[in-house]
Design a protein with these regions (language model features):
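Nucleic acid-machinery interaction/catalytic patches
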Residues: 1-209
Length: 209
């Protein structure tokens, strides 16, 4: 499967949800100490932690610029709190949220390094690391010369999956067989063919249609 391929390129195993949450809390508590912020206890962090993992996973899955996104989220929260009286109960609550959002980028960095040290990852991080490592693996001939990959049955890819496939295609080490129904592909009004129509415009992928 493509998940196994991503794991082989990234060198990271798949972390279990509870394990990832526990490691995320360690990164959170450590980041709080560095930033002189009082950390929430684990039981109050747990739900936030689940949402954070989901957000980090989406960012990495799409190879989105994590620093830009997370710092923008903090800035948006800061602007939204301008009108509040920070001495009021609502203001104090909002101030706590703002402190948390200001931690997101350093927390993401610490968590990433912690997971790499532990040789595990969530799906999105494994994909991002695989994309970062693949060019070097190819340059160093770490992938046997006779190895060839055939990707079949896809009609939508994450940003990381797309980048991996494009890199392998450019090196003539892969082909792709799309799960493409002409009815959905040729009709711009058919939402089911949205991603396939995008791939058809991609110079690395269009000759497989």
């Amino acid at each position: 499967t493509i998940d196994k391929l991503v794991a082989s390129f990234s060198g990271l195993g798949k972390g279990e949800p509870l394990e990832l949450l526990a490691l995320l809390y360690l990164s959170y508590a450590g980041t709080c100490r560095k930033e002189n912020v009082e950390p929430r206890p684990p039981d109050r962090f747990w739900e936030w932690g689940k949402m954070l993992l989901s957000d980090f996973n989406q960012i990495d899955n799409q190879l989105a610029p994590a620093q830009d996104i997370l710092q923008y989220m903090a800035e948006e929260k800061r602007i939204g709190s301008w009108h509040l009286d920070l001495g009021s109960s609502q203001g104090k609550l909002q101030s706590g949220y703002l402190a948390f959002y200001n931690l997101l980028w350093p927390l993401y960095q610490d968590f990433r390094q912690r997971l790499i040290h532990e040789n595990i990852a969530y799906t999105g991080l494994a994909g991002r690391i695989a994309c970062e490592r693949l060019p070097r693996l190819l340059q160093e001939n770490a992938i046997p010369r006779q190895t060839f990959y055939l990707f079949a049955g896809f009609n939508a890819l994450t940003g990381a999956e797309k980048q991996l496939i494009k890199t392998l295609v450019r090196e003539k080490k892969a082909e792709i067989i799309w799960n493409a129904d002409r009815y959905y592909l040729d009709d711009d009004m058919q939402e089911a063919g949205h991603f396939l129509r995008q791939y058809k415009q991609d110079p690395d992928l269009n000759h497989f249609f």
